[in-house]
A protein has these predicted regions:
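Alpha-helical transmembrane signal-anchor/signal-peptide segments
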Residues: 150-163
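Internal/C-terminal transmembrane anchor helices
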Residues: 125-152
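N-terminal low-complexity, Ser/Thr- and acidic-residue-enriched intrinsically disordered segments
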Residues: 71-77, 136-140, 161
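N-terminal membrane topogenic signal
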Residues: 7-23
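Membrane-embedded alpha-helical segments of integral membrane proteins
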Residues: 28-124
Length: 163
């Protein structure tokens, strides 16, 4: 007795995007918008932005419904890309914030890149969807190669300039 094999693949459930979109929207609001209206909350905004980044990573790994190779691959790509980017950014960015400036500022941008690419490519086939995530992550890291910092302002903000 044999089991009949069919060529029909089981349809994949679509990506669950709403938790990632909400996490990134909250992250950017806490990171950039709230400190504009309440300047004393700047350090809290940084911490909240990093916590929301953790929420995006947890969503992507456990709740996104993406194939496991895409889930792990995207996280590994982000880590490798930001470590590689640190080698080519201006020394003021690489050494700023006791060497943590790039990592702290990269978290919101990488989260936005991941969620935006996942949302834009969620109806595409595997190859184009992966290419969109790779392109978005590399673009997000590439932005930092165009910047330098003059230090920290009196309000505690980074003084970014174009290279």
């Amino acid at each position: 007795m044999t089991i009949a094999q069919t060529d029909e693949s089981t349809p994949r459930k679509p990506l669950r995007l709403w938790p990632g979109v909400i996490a990134v929207a909250l992250q950017w609001r806490l990171w950039f918008v709230v400190p504009v209206f309440f300047p004393e909350t700047g350090p809290h905004g940084i911490f909240a932005g990093l916590c929301a980044g953790l929420a995006v990573v947890l969503w992507w790994l456990f709740f996104s419904r993406a194939p496991w190779s895409d889930r792990v691959g995207a996280i590994v790509l982000m880590v490798v890309a930001i470590v590689a980017t640190k080698r080519v950014v201006h020394e003021s960015i690489a050494g700023g914030g006791m060497g943590m400036l790039l990592y702290i500022y990269a978290v919101p941008l990488l989260c936005l890149a991941l969620v935006a690419a996942a949302a834009a490519g969620h109806r595409r086939s595997t190859g184009p969807r992966r290419a969109m995530v790779i392109g978005a992550v590399l673009f997000a890291c590439g932005v930092f190669t165009l910047l330098r910092t003059g230090g920290i302002t009196g309000e505690g903000d980074s003084d970014f300039h174009w290279r």
